[in-house]
Amino acid sequence: MLNILNQVKMKAIIFFCFLGLSFSAVGFAQSSDWMNLDTVKAGKYDTGKMWTFEYPPMDYFESTYHFRPDDDWFEHVRMSALRFANYCSASFVSEDGLVMTNHHCARQSVTQVTKEGEDLHSNGFIAQTLEDERPVPGLYVDQMVLFKDVTDEVVDAINKASNDEERAQFENDKIDEIEKRESEETGLKISITPLYNGGKYSLYGYKTYTDVRLVFAPEEKIAFFGGDPDNFTYPRYNLDCSFFRVYDENGKPLKTDNFFKWSENGASVGEPVFVVGNPGNTDRLNTVAQLEYARDIQYPRTLELLNSLIDINKQLLSDDPSKKLQLEDMIFMLENSKKSINGVLEGLRDPILMQRKKDFEKNFRSAVDADPELKAKYGQLWDKIADSRKKLSEISNKSFALSKNRFTTPQYFFVADEVIAIAENLKLPENERDDLYVGDELDNTLSSLYSPDYDAKKDQMLLEAKINVMIKYLGADDPLVKEFAGGKSGKEAVEYILDKSKITNVDDIKDLLAEGPDAVINSDDPFIKLMLNSKSKAKEYADKVKEITDVESSYSQQLGIALFDVYGTSIPPDATFTLRLADGVVEGFPYNGTYAQPFTTFYGLYDRYYGQGEKSPWDLPKRWENPPAGLDLSTPFNFVSTNDIIGGNSGSPVINKNAEIVGIAFDGNIQGLPGNFIFRTEENRTVSVHSNGMREVIEKVYKLKRLSDELKAGKITD
């Protein structure tokens, strides 16, 4: 699935997945044994087809599809598209604020609106009336209503810097200044996004809608039919759609002039189609040195972390089935991210694909070297970036081993930090202490060290995982590691540490503090000693990593300017979770020695259901086990097209030339695995739910005629 993130854990996943994408881990590497790699050349669209609304390729559209959309078309499409919270895409599909996105984008929302005694993931959610539509706390959608180029203003500020370190600071300061100014002037949510690694800067203004209510979500079994084994494959049979509604400030369905009408016939073979959405992140413009670092260090490390987190959450679910809703959401997200990262890694290890990247870099570098002015400004940037990656390779794993974050680090570490802070404050007169460490506030601080829902078993498993990371990247004989774990590893190390610790519960912490601040600072508690003894080293590593990456960011920004000078808008910028338009056609592809047809049907769904013995994850919800009378099994269900998508595109509308809905994108095929760094037109496909299939089942399986009628009419009809 294309969505890698749920709204609660977005920042945490970014931390360790480096914005993973959403493609599978199944092997696909091409054999290069028979090929002379020197003959491998970059493809015309290796950098993809995620076109910005600022720089649409009009001539290309006209020559390829005999279609030259005008400004009104682009504005209507832009205003009809939405960003779904901070992790998916969506769109308005009726004048009454009806919103369409994927079911897997709605998982967290479904969990949130589930009432006691309900199991909406298993049974689905159907709002038969407007009054039945359920508000989702905290959910919002963004509509991009403004964009403009602010490159000159930002670059002028950057150019005033006297060194590479200052460039990043000057860039951030100017962006903050412009965003604040424009936000005050427009009343919109303003965000400035670097494109082409800083070759261009675009300002986007969003209107945010915060009253969003769930209208329809199918059962998990049909939305994610085939489960993890079928994920990121094709043929597929998934009803991966859901519908919400935006309400206005008066609590009425929002009236909007901009929405996508529903196509009467849906997508057809060979038809040009456009995916309108917010692709999250790609690294297609990265240098070869940056990609090699990702291949050799970043992604292998991330996969190890994901594997440990998946194991932990599966064990927690096995131990406590009452936490099924929350833990299954987390496991789903982690496994999706694992497949994504593993898929990118497989691609990076493919010598043919890497040779295509090397050829692109060679051509780009040759173009720069051929222009004396460009060569003088930018000719050394590739070597400088390679040098920075070499330096980063020497310390990043060590920095990672000593780093802390709230998602993957055991709570014990943060408790130790807080106990140390309390002790240091207790040395001071009350009037000089931080407010958190005085009187009743101190009691509150102590009580909050371990929350009522604190899970000690989970923390112990996170501790074991952290010990393994420290041993791997710092070494078992490292003084910090040796002292902390007592020369032990795994569960033995956990037992050793917890037996010696005095901060695993609030009562013991109070007893320790009662001995005085010096007793805390000089304690032999393993957590306290580790936090004190590792502080300077962790800061040293973190500062060095920041220094290297800040300087490299400056190099990448300059390289982005060179890229734009050489190629202009003939190639699109990397994905930035901002609105893009990706063109393609409905088309199958060769696979497994045969050919994947562009469409699947409900006949195929039932063939898969019975062919797999009606067993999970190919079992069906009760209402689907026997097709209802009138359901046309020949109706197209899912389909593939040649559009370019990535994580963040989940929920993107697929439209035709008339800006009508013909589908909703939810996945990519296995050949799209390396899409993070290279787009392959030959077999890369977008997998979508067909518009005809959605309406057919909404009306005939779910008996939700009011929704089916609204999609057909483009407005509420009753």
Predicted regions and their residues:
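Terminal presequence/propeptide segments associated with secretion/organelle targeting
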Residues: L2, K9, I13, F28-D718
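Bacterial N-terminal signal peptides
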Residues: I14-S24
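Short intrinsically disordered, low-complexity coil segments enriched in acidic
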Residues: M1-N3, S22
